[in-house]
Each structure stands twice: as structure tokens, then as C-alpha cells.
Amino acid sequence: MSILNRQASASVLYDTPGPKARTRYRAFGVLSVLGIAGLLWYVFNALNDNGQFDAGLWDAFQYTFVQQRIVDGLLSTLEAFGLAALFSLTLGALLAAGQLSDHRPVRWFCTAFTQFFRAMPLLILIVGLYYAFFAQQPMWALVLGLTLYNGAVQAEIIRSGVNAVPRGQGEAAYGLGMRKTQVMMSILVPQAVRSMLPTMIGQLVVTLKDTSLGFVITYHELLFVGKAIASQPINAAGFPYIPVVLVIGPIYIVMCLLLTALARWIEARGRRGANRRTSASA
């Protein structure tokens, strides 16, 4: 019965393609794959003709001081990300609470603050903070810029999650005599965070990648270190642009994958805890 229902719902959404349509779709798929493969082959040949895949370009990574610079850049990236993640989540929670406040001045201020920094280009914000206040401390210009921008985004995520909780739950809590602070902290916010956790972690992944903007203000994070290594010629082999990309790029990918895996683990653990509480109450 469920299979029939799925087929019926699918037929409502779109017409089932016939034999000619399926053949046409397969042809489009094959042509797309061939086109992408041809483009990749063209790029590979162009880079290979310029010597970007010469073995000599990898010699830079044999030196201990180069390896240490990459490690230091990675640690600087993680330091900036850790501070920005902590501060942006805290700021986002405060701004979300302010936007949901019953006091109009607080609600208006928090809403204006959130909308302003959401609309502000992050690079302009970081560069402005650097030249205005943190010319000698580029890390704090990067951290504060990431905090203001991502805090505003996190505030909207949390606010949307709270508003998505069924209204009846809050009304029932008020009916039991609970104050608004108790309703928010005990009922609405936990459910909002649980439902919006994937989106919040997704924004933290964006925060992690945005730490690479620190190279613009000479903060020695991972991208800045990679750019410095790539700008040094390796004897007669040339500049190691491709080797640097192949080393630095996967580091960012692994960090983002680990953060995503952490989010899935936290989400699964929260579901198991909720199921246990439901079973115990039953």
C-alpha cells in the first residue's frame, strides 16, 4: 500500500517519463559527463604544460621549517575559529533573545543590529576593523569580524527555530504559571536548538572557511602560509601553486568534514536522549 501511495504522490508531482524521454535524459547525462571530463583534461594539460606537476615543485614540503609553518598556520586557523565560534554563538543567542523580547526598544535594537551586520560584507568588516582598531593585532580583527557577521546569522537561525516550535507548547506552559524566561529556557529554546542544530553547525562550517579571509590583513593562518609558500620559487622548477593547493585544500576539507561529523553525532545523541525520555515517561 505504501508503494502505491508513493507512486501516486510521485505522479501528482510530475509526469513519469516515457521511453523517449528516458533515452534523452541518458544522452544528456552522458554528454554532461563527457563535457566535464573534457574540461578537466584541458585544465590538466594546461597546468602540465606550465610544469605545475613537476616532481621538483614538491621539494619545498621536505623542509622542516615549511612543515612547521603549515602546522603553525593550522593552529592559528583553529584558534581564530574557536574564538569566533564561541563568541558568535553567544552573540547569536543574545540577539535572538532580544528580538523575541516583549520590550520594544530592546527588540528594535537587536533587530536593527542583526540586519545591519547580516548585510555587511564580511571582508569589508574585517578590513575596516583591522585598519581602525587592530592594526597590530590582526587576529582580533578577524575574530571580531567573524563574530559580528556570524553572530547575526546565528541569531536569525535561533529566532526562526523558536518561532517554528508549535505555539500550543508555549501557551500550555504559560497556563501552568511559568514566566516567559522559564518558557524560553525550558521549552522553546531546547527544541529550537535541537531542530536547527544542522543549520547552526552548517554556519559554523562557513565560519571555519571564512577564517581564510585573514590572509588579507596578514594574519598568519593556513591560507596566508600557503600563499607565502607558493610565492617562493623552487629552484628552476618554478612556483609550487598546484602542490600548495593539493596540500592546503584537503586540510580545509578534513576540518569541515570533522565538524560536520561532530554535528551528526550531537544530533544523533540528542535524538537518542529524547527517545529515552519519551519511553521513560510512557
Region annotations inferred by a language model:
Residues 2-282:
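Transmembrane alpha-helices and adjacent helix-loop boundaries
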